[in-house]
Amino acid sequence: MATTAASSLLKSSFAGSRLPSATRTTTPSSVAVATPRAGGGPIRASISSPNPPYDLTSFRFSPIKESIVSREMTRRYMTDMITHADTDVVIVGAGSAGLSCAYELSKDPTVSVAIVEQSVSPGGGAWLGGQLFSAMVVRRPAHLFLDELGVGYDEAEDYVVVKHAALFTSTVMSRLLARPNVKLFNAVAVEDLIVRRGRVGGVVTNWALVSMNHDTQSCMDPNVMEAKVVVSSCGHDGPFGATGVKRLQDIGMISAVPGMKALDMNAAEDEIVRLTREVVPGMIVTGMEVAEIDGAPRMGPTFGAMMISGQKAAHLALKALGRPNAVDGTIPEVSPALREEFVIASKDDEVVDA
């Protein structure tokens, strides 16, 4: 059955914009039913057949040559590398902000998106809540993004609680990686930026294990990925954090990276979203890396700002690409007085982590 143009659009929780989708319909192996969310509306659940569709007592795999496995993995990965050697958007860092950005961008099937994540497992710190606890707290109205994804939660007056943070992370990853215009390159590190005539034009990449062992090995030159827009979502400061803005400071494109100041949840989440922007031509900064460059407060174990900051970064990237479906998420220039207040506060002698 042919779908109409209206039915092929996905509604976004970010400013209510509607973006085209390239998803296709498949026949499910389970029956979807409506299940009440605790304190809220329905969520999607599945009731599978009680028995698997094969005989477990005499199960046998189809035969395969080992070389076929090698060829399939290699051919597909090399094809992805060739395809994304010159891409529309490169997202550096696959934490909650980077994944939310990629999800929002992926709704436009004409936009090619590459996500580069140095860890084997994407998701950043969004597999757990605070202090290695399971639950994820999301302040309203960011819960609308959870509704869009179909992630269930318990409701309170001003916030919602997802019973395990991994529910959000696994859901957003499975949704966006199923789309044909997105590729995740995990276990790959970004070592540098491509800069031409004052504009960021891509990233310099290497295998993460190679990048971590430059001091023990001889010359191991990197590779490159050109991009029309780079989104840096490298998180807070640390051994592998805030690398995008640190590199901008190293090469003189920004003057300072003062670091985030002490925790203030109510101020921090609003500021993270508000200050998400294109900091230099060709490079948008999102998530906790924003606090590092602006000296905004530490956010702590709440996650709504990561989601909405990522969505905002996506629409800024769409605007930079000239896409008509972009929501204008630009912000006024930060007042010098406000920026000075952040910077002074962030220079206190304190050791902070996310």
UniProtKB/Swiss-Prot annotation:
Substrate binds at A97, E117, Q118, G125, V190, D221, H236, M288, R298, M299, G300. Residues 20-32 have a biased composition (Polar residues). GO terms for molecular function: cysteine-dependent adenosine diphosphate thiazole synthase activity; iron ion binding. Its cofactor is Fe cation. GO terms for cellular component: chloroplast stroma; cytosol. One of its GO terms (biological process) is thiazole biosynthetic process. Its main location: plastid. Keywords: Chloroplast, Iron, Metal-binding, NAD, Plastid, Thiamine biosynthesis, Transferase, Transit peptide. SUPFAM superfamilies: FAD/NAD(P)-binding domain. Residues 17-49 are annotated as: Disordered. The keyword Iron applies. Residues 1-44 form a transit peptide. It is found in: Plastid, Chloroplast. The modification 2,3-didehydroalanine (Cys) is found at C219. During the catalytic reaction, a sulfide is transferred from Cys-219 to a reaction intermediate, generating a dehydroalanine residue. Signal peptide: none annotated. Coiled coil: none annotated. Highest expression in developing embryos and green leaves and a very low level expression seen in endosperm, roots, etiolated shoots and immature ears. Involved in biosynthesis of the thiamine precursor thiazole. Catalyzes the conversion of NAD and glycine to adenosine diphosphate 5-(2-hydroxyethyl)-4-methylthiazole-2-carboxylic acid (ADT), an adenylated thiazole intermediate. The reaction includes an iron-dependent sulfide transfer from a conserved cysteine residue of the protein to a thiazole intermediate. The enzyme can only undergo a single turnover, which suggests it is a suicide enzyme. May have additional roles in adaptation to various stress conditions and in DNA damage tolerance. Homooctamer. This is Thiamine thiazole synthase 2, chloroplastic.
